[in-house]
């Protein structure tokens, strides 16, 4: 019985570990799984893309001035002061072009507006992935040079 409890506890701890989203160097954050499209909108505005677009609610991070350090090792450290780390350029997978044929991933863009797709194309291009409520969501982040 104790062995079974130990195995279940170990399995729970393994599955419950924290997964960080891909970030611009020196940044780390959790993905806001419930509202990825709004997060992309916030990030595009923060990066100065589509600055005329008005947000209907505040962006999900309280203090956009503070950033984590530029040390890459810092990306994997835990920190109690999480409220200052915010997402960068999150999105869903794009259609991949292969020769003259376009291959769609499991998420279709037919239901998305042209403006949503424009946000995605403007802000995102480096691929990684993150587990969002047991669903893999692909994230993209363009590195902007100052």
From Swiss-Prot:
Disulfide bonds: 33-123, 42-59, 44-141, 124-132
GO CC annotations on file: extracellular region
Alphabetized UniProt keyword annotations: Cleavage on pair of basic residues, Developmental protein, Differentiation, Disulfide bond, Glycoprotein, Hormone, Secreted, Sexual differentiation, Signal, Spermatogenesis
A Pfam match: AGH
GO terms (BP aspect): cell differentiation; sex differentiation; spermatogenesis
Superkingdom of this protein's organism: Eukaryota
Signal peptide: 1-21
Chain positions carrying an annotated carbohydrate: 133
Function noted in UniProt: Controls sex differentiation and the formation of male appendages, spermatogenesis, pigmentation, and male specific behavior.
Designated name of the protein: Androgenic gland hormone
Phylogenetic classification of the source organism: Eukaryota, Metazoa, Ecdysozoa, Arthropoda, Crustacea
